[in-house]
Every structure is written in C-alpha cells, then in structure tokens.
Amino acid sequence: LLIESTYGGRVREDFDASLKKFEQDLARDIKKYNTIVQTCFSLDRLQKILFYTIDMQKKGLIPNNIPILVDSKMGAEYINPYIDEAKKMLREASHPSQLAVNTKNLENFIDYLDPKNKNYEVISTETRAGILGELDGKKKIILTASGMAEGGPVIEYFKRFADDEKSVFY
C-alpha cells in the first residue's frame, strides 16, 4: 500500500484562517522588505495567490503601485484556463469550489487575472534580468514556481535575493 502524504501528520487551517494569515503577513512584510518572493505550485496555487494578492491591492491592504511579477511559464499558461472556468461557472451558476473563491468573487477573479488589465506582469528567462534590473531597490512581489527548491526560476531568485536583508521568501 502506497499513500501520498505531502501534508501527512499535519492539521491544516481552514481556508478563511489561512487567507487572513496570508493577508496579514503580506501587508506586514511589504512595509519591511523590497522584494517578496512567493514560491508556489504552478497549477492552482499560483493562480489563487495571484488573485488574492491583486485583491489586496484593490482593497488597499497593500499599495497598488507595487508590481506583481509572475515567473512561471506553466503557471502563466494556466491563467487563461482558470479564467475560462470561472466564466463557465458564472454562466452555469455552479459553485466555484474548484477555484476556492466564492461566487461574488468570480467576476473579480476574471477581471483581475485577465492579462489585458495589466494587474500583473509575466516574466520569463529572457526578460527576467532586465525587469529585475529596472526594479532593483524597488518594492516588488514575485510569484514563481518552486520546483521543490531543486530547479526552476526559484533557483535564480535564491541566488539573487537569499543574502539580501530587504528580501523575504514565502
């Protein structure tokens, strides 16, 4: 018998408590640090964290002039399918449990994550150095694929920001 146990032996907080803690931590840390690197799974987690980070800006919980950068090719590729699924849920009046947002947030989810609204910027291996150079010493929030800290963009962020006292990793 083989059982996957990523969260084995741990009791996880309920969603609302986790979201509140995330909001409190981000609001506190954005005042203290220039760079926040949020590592996350490319599928599902990145899209949710992106939504809630933009939502915090829209609500005035964190400054809305701080750039949010998405550095995950796969994570960026899954944004539009998530938007499509949210639109489908609205059309069909189905419950949005798969997106972990309540019905009143579906329209915001669609709006905030729509790339044409420029609430965030997708960066890549080719554009990373230039964009980070432009933002050197300025506040920024970076959502990146974690690769279990063994590979992917997060390695570049470890190299660049691990020793920087004005940077924090989530």
Regions found by a protein language model. Name each.
Residues 1-18, 32:
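Metallo-beta-lactamase
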Residues 23-170:
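Hard-cation-handling environments
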